């Protein structure tokens, strides 16, 4: 995983050039938006269990066969695995948001995820639906439109961060 600073340094070093121009401007923007980014990650982390459990509940409401005998969420062990996977996905999305880079999400979470789910017989359409529900909830927390938020919101527009977190969830959905 490379953060915004490491990327700029590596790119400049490869060109044997000083850091300047648009790279420096982008880093200045990244720093000035840092508190919003930290707050956004905090909103997601502080509400992670609610985000995940609501997503899994929504997935099950739309497909009740998942909790019927033989369903992929039937038995406590399978339900716990489903919740755990949702927590892992959400955690890596928050890491990507913090770094401003999706490589940690792609390398450590999404690489081989679809193949694993197929091998285990996990219905990918239901999983993708749960991810979409998590996306909607996370975006609502970042933009301060969630009805049950637990933390105070810093002043400022977070629509760019909401769009960014949305793209990370889109990557998860498309990889499943």
Curated annotation (Swiss-Prot):
Phycourobilin binds at residues 50, 61. Keywords: Antenna complex, Bile pigment, Chloroplast, Chromophore, Electron transport, Membrane, Methylation, Photosynthesis, Phycobilisome, Plastid, Thylakoid, Transport. The modification N4-methylasparagine is found at residue 72. It comes from the Eukaryota. The keyword Thylakoid applies. Contains two covalently linked phycoerythrobilin chromophores and one covalently linked phycourobilin chromophore. (2R,3E)-phycoerythrobilin 2 binds at residue 158. It is a peripheral membrane protein. The keyword Membrane applies. GO terms for cellular component: chloroplast thylakoid membrane; phycobilisome. One of its GO terms (biological process) is photosynthesis. Gene3D superfamilies: Phycocyanins (1.10.490.20). Its main location: plastid. It is found in: Plastid, Chloroplast thylakoid membrane. (2R,3E)-phycoerythrobilin 1 binds at residue 82. Light-harvesting photosynthetic bile pigment-protein from the phycobiliprotein complex. Belongs to the phycobiliprotein family. Heterodimer of an alpha and a beta chain. This is R-phycoerythrin beta chain. It comes from Aglaothamnion neglectum (Red alga). The gene is cpeB.
